[in-house]
């Protein structure tokens, strides 16, 4: 069977049309895939940016909580303590040993170490001056009592007789944010420390020291 030129022409035309339609469909499918990929990428980037923003906000919230605990200043401190080594200075401070029966004994929960909460039971006399500085010792009572069995060392008491802890003790140091405050309007700055202490066993006063 012989094909005429007209038949060959029509066959080639149909073939070209078929290729054109197939190519068009292929391009449409490729464009759809690319568009879907772009949408997925945009969603991923948007989600990633949102996660980073949330993480940043959480970090700022955590930092604010920590700063509030450590500083806790409603009234700006009159004498700012800039270094842990300056806490307490060379003065003998009133101290209290917190036993396990005390709700503030827990060392792991720093929110239980906030000075305004710790100091509240000691501030009963209304219109009396606030206690300027105070130390809470978060150790077993027997551990603290054992310090009194150690050799006596010199300290800033009149008698000059104190006893030194064998290791740094877990302490909460409370400092009045501004002098002149009276009960019940006492506001304290909180410092959580691990320091050696010099202790007078007669009247339970301590001196905080960094020296081993």
Swiss-Prot record:
This entry's Gene Ontology molecular function terms read: nucleic acid binding
Q: In which tissues is it expressed?
A: Male-specific expression in proximal caput of the epididymis.
SMART domains linked to this entry: RNAse_Pc (SM00092)
Keyword set includes Protein biosynthesis:
no
Q: Which GO terms describe its cellular component?
A: extracellular region
Q: What kind of modification does the protein receive after translation?
A: The N-terminus is blocked. Glycosylated.
Location of the protein in the cell: Secreted
Q: Which PANTHER family match?
A: INACTIVE RIBONUCLEASE-LIKE PROTEIN 10, RIBONUCLEASE
Q: What does this protein do?
A: Secreted proximal epididymal protein required for post-testicular sperm maturation and male fertility. May be involved in sperm adhesion to the egg zona pellucida. Does not have ribonuclease activity.
What is the protein name given in its UniProt record?
Inactive ribonuclease-like protein 10
């Amino acid at each position: 069977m012989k094909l005429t030129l007209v038949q060959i022409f029509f066959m080639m035309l149909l073939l070209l049309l078929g290729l054109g339609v197939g190519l068009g469909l292929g391009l449409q499918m490729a464009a759809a895939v690319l568009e879907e990929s772009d949408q997925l990428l945009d969603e991923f980037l948007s989600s990633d940016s949102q996660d980073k923003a949330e993480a940043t906000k959480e970090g700022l919230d955590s930092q604010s909580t920590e700063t509030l605990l450590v500083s806790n200043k409603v009234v700006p401190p009159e004498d700012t303590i800039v270094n842990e080594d300056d806490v307490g200075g060379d003065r003998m401070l009133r101290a209290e040993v917190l036993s396990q029966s005390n709700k503030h004994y827990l060392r792991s929960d720093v929110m239980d170490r906030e000075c305004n909460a710790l100091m509240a039971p000691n501030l009963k006399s209304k219109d009396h001056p606030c206690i300027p500085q105070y130390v809470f010792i978060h150790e077993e009572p027997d551990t603290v009592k054992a310090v009194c069995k150690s050799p006596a060392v010199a300290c800033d008491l009149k008698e000059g007789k104190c006893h030194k802890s064998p290791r740094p003790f877990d302490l909460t140091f409370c400092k009045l944010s501004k002098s002149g405050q009276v009960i019940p309007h006492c506001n304290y700055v909180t410092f959580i420390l691990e320091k050696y202490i010099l202790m007078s066993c007669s009247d339970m006063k301590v001196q905080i020291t960094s020296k081993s």
